[in-house]
From Swiss-Prot:
CDD domains: SfsA-like_bacterial. This is Sugar fermentation stimulation protein homolog. It comes from the Bacteria. InterPro entries: SfsA (IPR005224), SfsA_C (IPR040452), SfsA_N (IPR041465). Disulfide bonds: none annotated. Pfam families: SfsA (PF03749), SfsA_N (PF17746). GO terms for molecular function: DNA binding. Belongs to the SfsA family.
Amino acid sequence: MRVAVFDCDGFHKKFWSPVVKFPTPLIEGKLIKRYKRFLSDIELPNGDVVVAHCPNTGSMKRCQQDGARVWLSKSDNPKRKLAYTWELVEVDAQYLACINTGYPNKLVGEAISNGVVKELAEYPEQKAEVKYGEKSRIDWLLTGNDGRKCYVEVKSVTLLEEDGLGYFPDAVTDRGRKHLYELAKMVEEGHRAVMFFCVSHTGINSVTPAAHIDKKYAQAFVEVVKKGVEVIAYQVAIDSQEMKVVRSVPVVMPTLLD
């Protein structure tokens, strides 16, 4: 098992292993409701209802059905206002999705460092959360032996609507569109730029921009791909102990209608 150490541009050094494990054994529960974006009421197996932190600012479309099975982590830190964090949800009574948006960047960093992502092999230097563009941070900045840089923006995909096809975004995102144009700018400056869809839903077999949800994002996606921004997607294997990036899945270009 190889462990890489990265100097993360202002962050503490982080240790990555081939598998991202949850910090504590997860606790199964039942979702009562999500509210105020960051809060959720969860019923535990003993019947107690706890308020858990929901680490996801998105709409979580199809991933927050009342009554769904969910899995929580519990912190022993007495300074935390909420001891529980919502990590996973069962979708359509058969798939698992990771709703904690703090994990995709870690998963992708682990996959790159361990050679799982063949498209991003042979970049000996990796830095996380590096400032670039207009008041933005790139998720991963890779540097090759020749000094050429590769900018990698990571997006988590959890919206499944039909036949294994996953959609991003699950709500209108001006910020996401801005990230696309910033990647295109890096290409114009002579660098490599990659949009990396981290498929955090076990039922998703391919990914496409959600033109029916955010047409402007889909239009920008098509535009920047024509300018040289690369797009790749990898699926994550998920269970209640750990997660890991396992395989490449196709990216389908959107159909844009007037």
